[in-house]
């Protein structure tokens, strides 16, 4: 599955998403590897088979093996951390903030790529997963490492569009009685 095939499957009511998917992946203040790493992490968070396949296939042209693995790892570890820390953040129980998480997160300390890139990709996944505490932490890290507000906005725009595309494809699949990986838009 290619990005163009994904765009072709979007129904006319999602034309804005079709156009945005092309633009956020090609027009950015980010380096190409940063764009595609953010896209992978967002696709993992969005959980649509075809979106993930298309994004990872295209990203393989822009990232080396270490970058692909690190972007997948960002999506994976944020799948855990975003649930945990969103609960800590939103719970009325102040004790949660005092107790150690006791969850392995070694990949954050040694992602195999530049730390700023991994943090940016984690921010993209956190935006999809809606963890405010994680968004703030990753935003602070990338800003501290020299990224601009525009860089952060571009990563979040990528995440937003990928999430929306996955949502539409899943909804259209549900309406047609198919699973999310085989739907065809009318």
From Swiss-Prot:
Gene Ontology molecular function terms on file: alkyl hydroperoxide reductase activity; disulfide oxidoreductase activity; hydroperoxide reductase activity; peroxiredoxin activity
InterPro entries, alphabetized: AhpD, AhpD-like, AhpD_core, CMD-like
EC number: 1.11.1.28
Enzyme class: oxidoreductase
Catalytic reaction annotation: N(6)-[(R)-dihydrolipoyl]-L-lysyl-[lipoyl-carrier protein] + a hydroperoxide = N(6)-[(R)-lipoyl]-L-lysyl-[lipoyl-carrier protein] + an alcohol + H2O
Listed Pfam families: CMD
Superkingdom per UniProt: Bacteria
GO terms for biological process, alphabetical: cell redox homeostasis; response to oxidative stress
Disulfide pairings: 131-134
SUPFAM superfamilies for this protein: AhpD-like (SSF69118)
Alphabetized UniProt keyword annotations: Antioxidant, Disulfide bond, Oxidoreductase, Peroxidase, Redox-active center
Family designation: Belongs to the AhpD family.
Role of this protein: Antioxidant protein with alkyl hydroperoxidase activity. Required for the reduction of the AhpC active site cysteine residues and for the regeneration of the AhpC enzyme activity.
NCBIfam families per record: ahpD (TIGR00777), ahpD_dom (TIGR00778)
Full protein name: Alkyl hydroperoxide reductase AhpD
Organism: Rhodospirillum centenum (strain ATCC 51521 / SW)
Lineage: Bacteria, Pseudomonadati, Pseudomonadota, Alphaproteobacteria, Rhodospirillales
């Amino acid at each position: 599955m290619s990005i163009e095939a994904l765009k072709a499957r979007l129904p006319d009511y999602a034309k804005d998403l079709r156009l945005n998917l092309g633009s956020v992946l090609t027009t950015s203040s980010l380096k190409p590897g940063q764009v595609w790493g953010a896209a992978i992490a967002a696709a993992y968070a969005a959980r649509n088979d075809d979106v993930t396949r298309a994004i990872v296939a295209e990203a393989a042209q822009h990232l080396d093996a270490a970058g692909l693995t690190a972007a997948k790892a960002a999506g994976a570890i944020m799948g855990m951390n975003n649930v945990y820390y969103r609960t800590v953040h939103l719970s009325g129980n102040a004790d949660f903030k005092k107790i150690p998480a006791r969850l392995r997160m070694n990949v954050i300390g040694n992602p195999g790529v530049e730390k700023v890139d991994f943090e940016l990709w984690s921010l993209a996944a956190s935006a999809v997963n809606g963890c405010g505490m994680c968004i703030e932490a990753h935003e602070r890290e990338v800003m501290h490492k020299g990224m601009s507000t525009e860089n952060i906005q571009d990563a979040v725009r990528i995440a937003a569009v990928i999430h929306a595309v996955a949502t539409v494809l899943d909804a259209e699949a549900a309406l047609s009685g198919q699973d999310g990986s085989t739907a065809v838009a009318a």
